[in-house]
Design a protein with these regions (language model features):
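Sec-dependent N-terminal signal peptides
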Residues: 4-16
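Cysteine-centric segments in proteins
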Residues: 20-119
Length: 119
């Protein structure tokens, strides 16, 4: 019984931690993304996790404020840069996309994430 109670408390604690942030999840995203809404949705939280790396530790509010195509679509592969506002900082997150028969795929290069402004 103690083990179950401890597990339940741990899960509740993790749930609270996960929802302690405010993420803008409105789709379609602003800007010129050519990823469809489903691919944007699948990529959204991964992009936000990379924005956490550059945000201030006390930052709780995150929003994608722009998207742009940085490498044009060739053979169903392209790259976009998503601009994410994280409180007083703005970060650019480069995302490589690829469409295959089984669906869309994406990859983020962690070394490509950059802070572009800080207030």
């Amino acid at each position: 019984m103690k083990k179950v109670l401890f597990s339940l408390i741990a899960v509740l604690g993790l749930t609270t931690a996960v929802f302690a942030y405010n993420y803008d999840t409105n789709l379609p995203l602003p800007g010129n993304s050519i990823a469809d809404a489903k691919l944007q949705e699948n990529t959204l939280f991964t992009a936000y996790m990379f924005a956490h790396r550059v945000a201030s530790p006390d930052c709780k509010d995150f929003a994608i404020v722009d998207t742009s195509v940085s490498k044009e679509r060739v053979d169903n592969k392209w790259q976009e840069v998503w601009t994410i506002k994280a409180c007083t900082k703005t970060a650019t997150v480069p995302i490589n996309f690829e469409l295959k028969e089984e669906g869309g795929m994406y990859a983020i290069d962690p070394m490509g994430v950059r802070v572009t402004s800080s207030n």
